[in-house]
């Protein structure tokens, strides 16, 4: 089992068990992925590669394995989304305004993963400041989805904002990667790239050291190729952190240990409002098929109402930009990052922010500033927060009669790199099924279930109660087993090899 291609196809669980038996070393596993990264640079999945650091960490992992002191992710090569501060390794958040910024400290999540033995291959690409659904707003250029349609060779988006993480894992450049999810930024790219993506309950993973977008929504989570791997990685990432005032002081269970796939008696809710007029027939059929899979596995299907769902997108696109406008006020060119000289301090601020922020970030900062302005605060931001509370109450009511919800993850399969680029509203609609879960702070899991008629992966989303990731993951395992999704992107079958 030392063939490089074979090594990069392994799951975290398979690699962990094989290394424990001495089948190969962490360094061999890391070198296989570094070679894959070099071959796959055309995907633009990484902003910064750290091969020397990765090899050093892999060697130390080997020493711990030999000493019988292996961590739960010992020797597993992963990507870290370039929104997580990494001590001594530049962090850009996909923006020009953080040019040259090298953090003097480590984010809690990446530190937890390092303590668990994970090996960092590099920092993955993302939409600028995690604002986007396509990974086209990155100052480092767009990420290419490893998947292609069966009827054309147009390059596709991987989704966003965690598109680099998604492309890296789908393309076997990394075994797993961290993502962040504000309104769907883990789940949507996971669906577009045929991966498992988990947004944990808000407060499950620390936000300390994660560059902020919308502080009441941002949540770190794992992006993997299997549900079991997501469970393993979440255990390593999670935990109360006194450095983060929103980190929940709750016990972190062994998510992998409770995975059985037995969902007999599980009550699965199907929200009526998630089947709007004009829903893509393929998405509707996939949802129906997924529901039948869970029913065949012993679950009971129950229709539920989430009446305020129709207001979720409008609410999100007031709350998130408002928080972003406040968070991004700190980028002024004074203490770190890009600085464009000006004759006055105000001119320096203006020139720096104009040159440093991309179009989408500027758009959201302006929207947020407007929503928070004295004359409009009550009409927009305050009203949005009230509607957000109603959306959360809808979920609470639904969970009185069901254990999990099953919905589509996205309204379509991955779209072309040059599609919808000039239409921000159409782009925002990509989050229509994921945003309500984020507003409520609930855990949401996207699982690949099938392919579209054009050969692209499609995912379904499972939503659970607060801090009940165990039930969500177990239902996800049942769905994963029933769907038996094993297809690989064209990048792995040779169709793109000549382009990379």
Swiss-Prot record:
It is an enzyme of class 6 (ligase). One of its GO terms (molecular function) is ATP binding. Transmembrane segments: none annotated. The keyword Nucleotide-binding applies. PROSITE patterns: AMIDASES. One of its GO terms (biological process) is translation. Keywords: ATP-binding, Ligase, Nucleotide-binding, Protein biosynthesis. InterPro entries: Amidase, Amidase_CS, Amidase_dom, AS_sf, GatA. It holds the Pfam family Amidase. GO terms for cellular component: glutamyl-tRNA(Gln) amidotransferase complex. The active site is at residues 81, 161, 185. HAMAP family: GatA (MF_00120). Belongs to the amidase family. GatA subfamily. Allows the formation of correctly charged Gln-tRNA(Gln) through the transamidation of misacylated Glu-tRNA(Gln) in organisms which lack glutaminyl-tRNA synthetase. The reaction takes place in the presence of glutamine and ATP through an activated gamma-phospho-Glu-tRNA(Gln). This is Glutamyl-tRNA(Gln) amidotransferase subunit A. It comes from Rhodospirillum rubrum (strain ATCC 11170 / ATH 1.1.1 / DSM 467 / LMG 4362 / NCIMB 8255 / S1).
